[in-house]
């Protein structure tokens, strides 16, 4: 019988919602190959997922496997590796860090019910987005929230491809994209997508000019209520940077830490 790799972590299990829609997942038994041919610039749409953290000989092995499995298929300029642990085990990451890889440490939070955040914004109108102009504003908001380590031109290409995937998924009934508006100006947005009654949040972003007003917490709360009531979920999942304040906002709404997720990625920063 052919060996299969079973993914145990809630974070990575829900990450696979997206390549299952329009990408490819190749199960090699001892690792998974995740591909998004429509968006090769999407680092975490084109990565390898291993069952365990890197061991002492895995630096060279993992790079070789990435080149064979992903680099040979797509025109990529990055490497990305995840491992299916739930307690944040690092393993032998030093050789990767010495070669310029980034270590990503995230907390996976979940909840079955939410509560009104302590800083609730009553000025914003929150609703699912459907119109072309709303989607374009969402794209522009996502680009405005670009991390500074990425070039604007490259990030625009990546983000437009990513948002087109999300739009197609909403059209297929697999989730919802929600915006927070002040009059007709979108100031924050996010997505929630469904698998097996689990709703996974994506790309929670508030425009830099509208932060610290309670908009993020209000948006997540209202989107959570919508997902629990209208799109058939009973569990909500959020993945956040362990060292970023957003996790505290989510906890104020009722999310609780469940797992710790670790990954590594690399790209040529001389091109930024």
Could you describe each region identified by the protein language model?
Residues 150, 157-205:
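A conserved beta-strand-loop-helix scaffold within acyl/acetyltransferase catalytic domains
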Residues 1-13, 49, 53-54, 117-162:
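Short amphipathic alpha-helix that is part of the acyltransferase structural core
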Residues 58-136, 264-266:
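Acyl-donor-binding surface of acyltransferase catalytic domains
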Residues 73-85, 227-241:
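Conserved GNAT acetyl-CoA-binding A-motif
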Residues 59-67, 203-208, 212-229, 248-252:
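Conserved acetyl-CoA-binding loop-helix of GNAT-fold acetyltransferases
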Residues 24-29, 85, 91-102, 174-188:
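Conserved beta-hairpin
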Residues 87-103, 213, 217, 242-260:
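Conserved active-site alpha-helix within GNAT-family acetyltransferase domains
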Residues 1-76, 87-89, 168:
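N-terminal charged segments
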């Amino acid at each position: 019988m052919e060996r299969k790799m079973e993914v145990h972590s809630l974070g990575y299990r829900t990450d696979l919602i997206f390549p299952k829609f329009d990408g490819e997942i190749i199960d090699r038994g001892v690792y998974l190959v995740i591909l998004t041919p429509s968006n090769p610039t999407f680092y975490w749409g084109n990565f390898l997922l291993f069952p365990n953290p890197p061991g002492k000989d895995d630096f060279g092995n993992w790079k070789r496997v990435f080149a064979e499995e992903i680099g040979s298929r797509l025109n990529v300029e990055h490497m990305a590796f995840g491992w299916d642990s739930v307690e944040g085990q690092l393993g032998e990451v030093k050789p990767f860090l010495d070669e310029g890889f980034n270590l990503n440490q995230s907390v996976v939070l979940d909840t079955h019910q939410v509560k009104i955040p302590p800083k609730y914004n009553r000025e914003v109108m929150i609703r699912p987005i459907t119109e072309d102009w709303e989607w374009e504003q969402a794209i522009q908001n996502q680009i405005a929230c670009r991390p500074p380590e990425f070039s604007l031109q490259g990030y625009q290409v990546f983000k437009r491809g990513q948002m087109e995937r999300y739009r197609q998924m909403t059209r297929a009934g697999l989730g919802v994209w929600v915006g927070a508006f002040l009059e007709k100006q979108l100031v924050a947005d996010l997505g929630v997508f469904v698998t097996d009654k689990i709703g996974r949040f994506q790309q929670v972003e508030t425009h830099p000019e509208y932060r610290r007003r309670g908009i993020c917490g209000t948006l997540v709360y209202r989107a959570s209520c919508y997902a629990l009531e209208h799109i058939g979920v009973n569990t909500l999942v959020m993945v956040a940077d362990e060292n970023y304040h957003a996790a505290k906002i989510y906890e104020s709404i009722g999310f609780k830490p469940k797992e710790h997720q670790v990954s590594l990625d690399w790209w040529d920063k001389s091109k930024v």
